[in-house]
Amino acid sequence: MAQTLQMEIPNFGNSILECLNEQRLQGLYCDVSVVVKGHAFKAHRAVLAASSSYFRDLFNSSRSAVVELPAAVQPQSFQQILTFCYTGRLSMNMGDQFLLIYTAGFLQIQEIMEKGTEFFLKVSSPSCDSQGLHPEEAPSSEPQSPVAQTLGWPACSTPLPLVSRVKTEQELDSVQCTPMAKRLWDSSQKEAGGSGGNNGSRKMAKFSTPDLALNRMPQPLSMATATAAVAVVAVGGCVSGPSMSERTSPGTSSAYTSDSPSSYHNEEDEEEDAGEEGTDEQYRQICNMYTMYSMLNVGQTAEKVEALPEQVVLESRSRIRVRQDLASLPAELINQIGNRCHPKLYDEGDPSEKLELVTGTNVYITRAQLMNCHVSAGTRHKVLLRRLLASFFDRNTLANSCGTGIRSSTNDPRRKPLDSRVLHAVKYYCQNFAPNFKESEMNAIAADMCTNARRVVRKSWLPKTKPLHLVEGDNYSSFISDTCKIEPDMMSMEHSFETASHDGEAGPSAEVLQ
C-alpha cells in the first residue's frame, strides 16, 4: 500500500487573505462594488459571502456587480468591517464600538457580534479605563498604504494604480477623528518622552473650540493620524488603547455659576465637571451615526418609544423644576452650554411637541421635558444623564432593573436590563453634550440610580402608623373604645408629644405622622 505524504504550510490561509486584501486595495480581480452613501468599495464576492450572511443571501438572489447598502450604514463603519472580513482585525476610535456592533448585526457577521460584544464590555468597564497606550505600542509613522497601515500589514511592493480612489474613500464628512487623534497622539508622545511621574503625563494640552474648528476643515483624512487615536483590536486579543482616565477636556471649562434667583443649578445633586462646547456640525455628524439604531429591528418597524407622561415624572422625581412657559432655552443657559443640545431647543416651539432624542432611534421626548432636563442640569453632564433616565424610566422600573442594557443582573436574575434603545440613545445624547463623558461612568450612574430606586421602594414597604386619636370611626378604634377606656391625661400626653414632634428636630417625620 502506497504511503501518503502530507505537507502543511502554516498560516497559508492568512497569507491568501492578505494577498486578497492587497488586491482589493489595488482594485484587482474585484467582482463586486458595494456603494455606501455614494462611496464605492471594491471587494470580492467570495470573501464577503464567507464573512457575512447578509451578503451571502444578497448574492444568491442577485448577480449585479454593484450592490448598494441602506442609508443607515455609515461609510466609515463599513470600511472598518470590510477590512475585518479580509484581516480579522478591527480598528476603531474609542466610543465607536456600539456603531460597529450595530453595523455587524445588520450585515449578520456573527464573529463580531459574539466576540466583539464580550471584548467591548471589557473595554467599557472601569478596570480597562486605566490601561494606557504604552510608548512601545505607539503606532508606527512609517509610510504605508492608506488602509493597510491601520491593520499593521506590510505595504504592498507592487504599484497601486487606484490609491487615489482608495484615498477618496477616507474623505468622509460624517466621521472626522483628527482632533481626537491629535490629542491622544500628544498624550502618547508625552508619555514616551519620559515625563517625570504621573503629574507630567496628566498635564496634557487643551485645545480650545477654534482649534477644533480648524482641525474640522474639509481635508483628506490622514490615516497615519487616525491610527494614533485608535486601538488596533485583534478579536479575542488583549486590550491596548489610549488611557481614558487621563483624558482632559478639549475645551475650556465653563461652570454655570449664576447666583441669581433664576439660577439653573440644583444644589441637591453633586457637583459635576463642566462640559465642552460643540457646534451644530458636531451634532449632525454624531446624529449620522445614530441612524444605525434603526437596524436593531431588522425586517420590522422599530417600536416607537416615548418618555413618561409629565405627571408620572413629577410623582417620581418631585425635585425636577417644570417650566412649561419656556418655549426655547434661556439665553443665559445657551451662553454657558453653547450648541450642544437638541437643535430644536434653540428655536421656539410648542412645549408639548415630541422630539426624537437622537435621529434614527425612534426614542421621543417632549420639548418641555427635554428642556427641563437641560435647565436642571446646567453644564453638568452627569446630572443631565440622571434627568434623562428619570424621564424614560419610573422608579419601579429602575428598582427592578440592573442598570445596563446588555444583560441581566448577576446578583439577582429577576432584575432585567433596561431598554437598550432608550439607554443607548440617552448615552449618546449625553456624549454629544460632553464628549469626554466615558461610558463606564454612565453605566455606574445608571446602576446607582437603580440602587437608589430600590432603597426608596424598600422604604415604601414600611407601614405608616397613626396616633390612636387620629384614627376615628374605624374598627380598630371602636374595638379599643369598647375594650378599654383611654384616660384623659394619656390623651393629653399624646397630644403634647405630637406637637413636640412637629416642632422639634428629634421627633418622627411629618411623613410618618400623616
Swiss-Prot record:
Residues 360-457 form the BEN domain. It comes from the Eukaryota. Homooligomer; mediated by the BTB domain. Interacts with HDAC3 and HDAC4. Interacts (via BTB domain) with CUL3, PSMD7 and RCOR1. Residues 30-94 form the BTB domain. It comes from Mus musculus (Mouse). Residues 267-279 have a biased composition (Acidic residues). Disruption phenotype: Mice are viable with no obvious developmental or physiological impairments. In addition, they do not display alterations in chronic responses to cocaine and amphetamine administration, but do however display significantly diminished acute behavioral and neurochemical responses to these drugs. Signal peptide: none annotated. This is Nucleus accumbens-associated protein 1. The gene is Nacc1. Residues 242-251 have a biased composition (Polar residues). Ubiquitously expressed with higher expression in the brain, kidney and liver, and at lower levels in heart, lung and testes.
